[in-house]
Amino acid sequence: MSLDPRGALVLFSGGQDSTACLAWALEHHAHVETIGFDYGQRHVVELECRVQVREAIARSFPLWAGRLANDHVLDLGLLGQISDTALTSARAIEMQANGLPSTFVPGRNLLFLGFAATVAYRRNLSVLVGGMCETDYSGYPDCRDNTLKALQVALSLGMATPMTIETPLMWLDKARTWALTDRLGGRALNELILEHTHSCYLGDRSVRHAWGYGCNACPACELRRKGYEAWCAGA
């Protein structure tokens, strides 16, 4: 079976990075679908944000609206049941003895991409797009370029058809991610990201800061804030 190379499935959480990837995919692919996962995350509010982001993109960007198609949300609650992490329980966010933060959910991206590949195969889409990055990131091994290249080979072999994993943010820091979305959609897209996307690990949307909503203390908020400030300083 040969899948359509013009179509892409974006792993879309409703955060800044996955929204940047969605915009990138809409600019580069003729048909774009999205997939999200409910895995018992503390910041489950992101599932509401992803709906708002899709609606806002469709309103603000008519060309992209014509390319934006089906949305899929999978229930992966089992992942929250088998992992004891600060993303899926009320644990403190801290560095662990193994050098990884307590927010690391082992195998999360491997599972996400595996399930996404299954949906993509059924939907005749050959490209998966993800916001994984090893520039500004927390050291998660399943975000690394070599991990994703190996997984691309495994998925292609396992599906008996070529599949591609595109990671447009892999070598971009957060400041350059803001610059990317500015190039793709200008001020309108960046304002949409500021207002509607969610990054905070604690799910806090009580206060909008200059860089968006969040607790302003967790690692995700820190990365987003510093990236926005660096982009503003250099813009």
Swiss-Prot record:
Pathway in which this enzyme or protein is active: Purine metabolism; 7-cyano-7-deazaguanine biosynthesis
UniProt cross-references to InterPro entries, sorted A to Z: QueC, Rossmann-like_a/b/a_fold
Pfam families: QueC
Cofactor detail note: Binds 1 zinc ion per subunit.
Binding-site residues for Zn(2+), renumbered to this chain: 200, 215, 218, 221
Chain sites annotated for binding ATP: 12-22
EC main group: ligase
EC number annotated for this UniProt entry: 6.3.4.20
Paired cysteines (S-S): none
Gene3D superfamilies documented for this protein: HUPs
Recorded superkingdom: Bacteria
Keywords in alphabetical order: ATP-binding, Ligase, Metal-binding, Nucleotide-binding, Queuosine biosynthesis, Zinc
Catalytic activity reported: 7-carboxy-7-deazaguanine + NH4(+) + ATP = 7-cyano-7-deazaguanine + ADP + phosphate + H2O + H(+)
GO BP, sorted A to Z: queuosine biosynthetic process
Reported cofactor(s): Zn(2+)
An example Gene Ontology molecular-function term: ATP binding
Family: Belongs to the QueC family.
NCBIfam families in the cross-refs: 7-cyano-7-deazaguanine synthase QueC
Known role: Catalyzes the ATP-dependent conversion of 7-carboxy-7-deazaguanine (CDG) to 7-cyano-7-deazaguanine (preQ(0)).
Protein name per UniProt: 7-cyano-7-deazaguanine synthase
Organism in which the protein naturally occurs: Methylibium petroleiphilum (strain ATCC BAA-1232 / LMG 22953 / PM1)
